[in-house]
Regions:
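Glycine-rich beta-strand-centered segment in the early N-terminal region that forms part
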Residues: 18-35, 48-96, 115, 135-142
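NAD(P)H dinucleotide-binding glycine-rich loop of Rossmann-like/cofactor-binding domains
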Residues: 90-177
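Hydrophobic/small residue at the entry helix of a nucleotide-binding pocket
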Residues: 158, 182, 206
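N-terminal Rossmann-fold cofactor-binding loop
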Residues: 201-204
Length: 207
């Protein structure tokens, strides 16, 4: 399959790499239909970010079609349209059960970010816990709606997590510092939670 490969700071290539396979009983393999570049991807692209030369891309926002499932997967089946969140846990440890799967105690790598999403196929771990099943198929949605759905893989969820962590409630006045994608999604989230006034602080007058 084709995948973006990090060669060195400032240089990415598209190369042929091995297609991922099922390795654990709750894995799925997903054919990516949409992916995007996060601001954090640019850290390693610009600076190297301690990445090894010719290593996996840092992409972590994607959605696609389930192609293969492990024997213990019950949430989805081949052919399902899903969103693959950037950070996810096992669903069983204390952190996950408390709602903080971003700090899962059982993720098999130092960070539970699922790198490598800028590829034709991805392997997704803990599919029963973290995959988001979307009704229908990609062709049922407009391009604009697909882009909106893709934000649920990271940036909108991150913005909502900020509003939830701040316990924004109906009638609250909220200040969001930073007008990047996450900040703007935090504004949306604060409005969803009933904030009466929202101030977005930034250096960009046009925003």
């Amino acid at each position: 399959m084709k995948a973006a490969v990090f060669e060195k700071a400032g240089q990415m290539v598209v190369d042929e790499v091995a297609k991922p396979t099922i390795q654990a009983s709750d894995d799925v393999v997903i054919r990516v239909v949409r992916g995007c570049v996060c601001g954090s991807d640019l850290w390693s692209y610009k600076e190297g970010d301690e990445k090894e030369a010719y290593s996996v891309n840092s992409g972590h926002e994607a959605m696609g079609i389930v192609e293969e499932v492990g024997p213990d997967v019950t949430l989805v089946k081949p052919g399902d349209f899903v969103i693959a969140p950037f950070t996810h846990g096992c669903g069983h440890c204390a952190a996950c059960l408390a709602g903080y799967d971003g700090t899962c105690e059982n993720h098999p790598v130092p960070t539970n970010w699922s790198n490598g999403y800028q590829a034709q196929y991805i392997r997704f771990q803990y599919a029963n816990w973290a995959l988001i099943k979307v009704p229908g198929q990609p062709e049922d949605y407009s391009e604009g709606m697909l882009k909106s759905l893709l934000t649920l893989s990271d940036v909108m969820a991150t913005g909502y997590h900020a509003a939830r962590s701040a316990n924004v409630q109906k009638g609250d006045k909220v200040v969001v510092i930073g007008d990047g994608a996450v900040g703007q999604c935090a504004v949306i989230a604060a409005k969803m939670r009933g904030a009466s006034r929202i101030v977005l602080m930034s250096r960009h007058a046009d925003r």
